Amino acid sequence: MSYAYLFKYIIIGDTGVGKSCLLLQFTDKRFQPVHDLTIGVEFGARMINIDGKQIKLQIWDTAGQESFRSITRSYYRGAAGALLVYDITRRETFNHLASWLEDARQHANPNMTIMLIGNKCDLTHRRAVTTEEGEQFAKEHGLIFLETSARTAHNVEEAFINTAKEIYKKIQDGVFDVSNESYGIKVGYGGGNAGPQTVKPGEGGAAKSSSCC
């Protein structure tokens, strides 16, 4: 299947906030409660439709550990969108957002669209960060904001697609030079290998972790 545009995404945030689970829910529509800890960077892809145009999302899921931050930073370059994820049940993951955002702003292109995601919103009884706090952080830093649950799929589609809509709007407004692929946008040529292909998260050598929801 051909596509009009390809958008590159990066998913960032602390270890265990559910980055890999969000990707798996979006690409495969399934939840994996026990998930391999991401080592380095993993990859997924899916086709979506915006305004009647086929858009291919190419999504890089990064490791949250500090030891992999240098690898993660190299993927900021050439990303049109970023999903910055925290866990609403773990206050420290919210407190670390400023550091992640600083990294993104320092290493990414200045027009990258950033979606702030408060994940695991199904665990309301364990909530440690209010929705209002997430909204306020997003407002202060010019981010889009949603709360999601990779377990129930709540708002997962919306998180990825709304980010793409914002990128598409920037293209329409002339913000991006789409001939420059360093912006994380590639114009499609109707090639034969444009269909949704996913390298499923968890494949490859990794250590087991059950902290993903």
UniProtKB/Swiss-Prot annotation:
GO terms for biological process: protein transport. It is found in: Cell membrane. A lipid is attached at residues 212-213 (S-geranylgeranyl cysteine). A motif (Effector region) lies at residues 35-43. It is a lipid-anchor. It holds the Pfam family Ras. Residues 194-213 are annotated as: Disordered. SUPFAM superfamilies: P-loop containing nucleoside triphosphate hydrolases (SSF52540). GO terms for cellular component: plasma membrane. GTP binds at residues 13-21, 61-65, 119-122, 149-151. One of its GO terms (molecular function) is GTPase activity. Protein transport. Probably involved in vesicular traffic. Belongs to the small GTPase superfamily. Rab family. This is GTP-binding protein YPTC4. It comes from Chlamydomonas reinhardtii (Chlamydomonas smithii). The gene is YPTC4.
